[in-house]
Amino acid sequence: MKVKIKQIYQFEGTSSLPAYSTNGSAGMDLYAAIASPMIIKPHETALVPAGIAISLPYGYEAQIRSRSGLASKFGVIVLNSPGTIDSDYRGELKIIMINLGQKDFQLTPAMRIAQMVIAKYEVISWEIVDDLDETERGEKGFGSSGLK
């Protein structure tokens, strides 16, 4: 599937287009479209531009997710992961990041900061009923299936 993309920010010496790291990658890396380094202090958030805008077909969304390396090594994640980019949004993609670590985290220009997964979704309509179909689980929730 071809998707239209607008480059809002041009990186010097490298591409700003989202890219798959390997042939088996589900997510494409997104890059920090910043001109100079920026610090995210512990327990603070930052809105980081990705330097692109996209035009997804109806019935598709882009999910913005954390990169596992940033999360495991530094405690830096996408705050609302997965963030949803709707098919009718045409503005620049911006990533809400939070530093859950204990030290300042420095973002550098063109750093890989998040990943984007394109997913198909269904548009539904509601059918109001008095009762739902029975299941073995029923209304049990919040730990009812145990830990092991």
Swiss-Prot record:
InterPro entries listed in its UniProt record: dUTPase (IPR008181), dUTPase-like (IPR029054), dUTPase-like_sf (IPR036157), dUTPase_trimeric (IPR033704)
Key words, A-Z: Hydrolase, Magnesium, Metal-binding, Nucleotide metabolism
Catalytic reaction list: dUTP + H2O = dUMP + diphosphate + H(+)
EC number: 3.6.1.23
Positions bound to substrate: R67, S68, G69, N80, T84, I85, D86, K94
Organism (species): Orientia tsutsugamushi (strain Ikeda) (Rickettsia tsutsugamushi)
Name used for this protein in its record: Deoxyuridine 5'-triphosphate nucleotidohydrolase
Single GO MF descriptor: dUTP diphosphatase activity
Family indicated by similarity: Belongs to the dUTPase family.
Names of the cofactor(s): Mg(2+)
One GO process term, biological-process aspect: dUMP biosynthetic process
Biochemical pathway: Pyrimidine metabolism; dUMP biosynthesis; dUMP from dCTP (dUTP route): step 2/2
Ligase among keywords: no
